[in-house]
Amino acid sequence: MIAEVKVYTTQTCPYCIRAKALLKKRDIPFEEIDVSRDEEKRGWLVKASGMRTVPQIFIDGKPIGGSDELHALDASGELEKLLHR
């Protein structure tokens, strides 16, 4: 069973585009949540992830970081392990 992936983004963020491109390339289903105009969601995101930047990526509710962290997990093979519990 594949894990649930959520990607918190803004509309103009190049790192968000990069992270989503990797997920699409790997055929990993994900839910995109645009926080660009929602202060409440942004506030929650900072509390949940400890970060003020986007994208922030969560796998089964656990923050894994942003685009760089996602790419590092993919390169090391760890992303596949996180996705298939």
Predicted feature descriptions by range:
Residues M1-P29:
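Local sequence-structure signature of Cys/Sec-based thiol-disulfide redox active-site neighborhoods
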Residues M1-T9, I59, E78-H84:
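Long, low-complexity, intrinsically disordered polar/charged segments
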Residues L22, R26-D27, K47, A72, ...:
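Non-catalytic interaction surface on structured domains
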Residues S49-F58, D68:
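Structural micro-motif
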